[in-house]
């Protein structure tokens, strides 16, 4: 459900109802695949699947918006603000614009995150010690248990 909401957010004002349903179904499968197969094969630590749901879902949603904006598919069309009316839909031009937007966003976020990760790593470190993680952070950081099991 969250993956569908993430994907339909960029398309909210442009996609028709059926297009939004199809986008949600497609992104659900893509995000499930990414959160299981890709995450396990790459071996990165994402316990809440934040990147698999929000990152991948947002990318698929942004690209899907370029498809679903087509009036022939029930979309709202692309507004041409220079003449003040709906412009003719050009799939190739729209997808190039969507790809540029996604690419710039991924680069900006990736570079900014890398800088911030390095700053945090230098100041306090990115991970807790292995023994503290094995013992449980509730005990090592808060000196109490969160769950009595």
Protein language model annotation of sequence segments:
Residues 1-149:
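Glycine- and aromatic-enriched membrane alpha-helices
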